[in-house]
Amino acid sequence: MKKLLIFPITAAMLLSLVACAQSAKPDVSLDTPAQEQTVSGSTQIPNPWESYDTADAAANAAGFTLTAPEAISGSSAKTYRVMNSGDGEVIFEILFETGADGEHAAYIHKASGTDDISGDYNDYAETETLDVNSRSVTMKGNDGLVNLALWTDGGYSYVLNVSEGLSQSDMIALVAEIQ
């Protein structure tokens, strides 16, 4: 009797083991939007930035304007972008590009509110707060050069980030032009 029970129990255990050992394949269909597709177990996230040909088109998408200098650090090639998170947070960005390598010399951000929207988490050796056109501007940098300027004005947060750093007087002049 025991021998009769051992065979069916062993067969059931082997079938269970084989069924459990099968790896689940991700379900990717052509009807699934790109942001929801799963490839190799990871979800692909779309680029949140939308590029625009002109400052006016970007301002229309953002719902507010951003006035910037003509050039920063010798770069006048600009890319206008807007990021709309969908929860009411909108960031208007102007990138000043350095060339074909896709690097940028500087960027300017503007968004509603008073939060730090720089996205720059570097530790700077020097931090100073100055008055520029009746705005309290925090400048951060290293070795006597300023890389980052942050301020708020009229219910908006602003950021000017310059990759190579500028003298404090040059950064003040640029901040004065941004609205």
What are the language-model segments listed below?
Residues 1-9:
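Positively charged n-region of N-terminal signal peptides that target proteins for export
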Residues 21-23:
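Bacterial signal peptide processing site
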Residues 36-146, 153:
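Short, solvent-exposed recognition patches
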Residues 154-179:
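Surface-exposed amphipathic alpha-helical segments
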Residues 16-19:
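C-terminal motif of bacterial Sec signal peptides marking the signal peptidase cleavage site
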Residues 25-35:
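N-terminal hydrophobic targeting segments that direct proteins to the cell envelope
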Residues 27, 65, 174-178:
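Conserved short hydrophobic interaction patches
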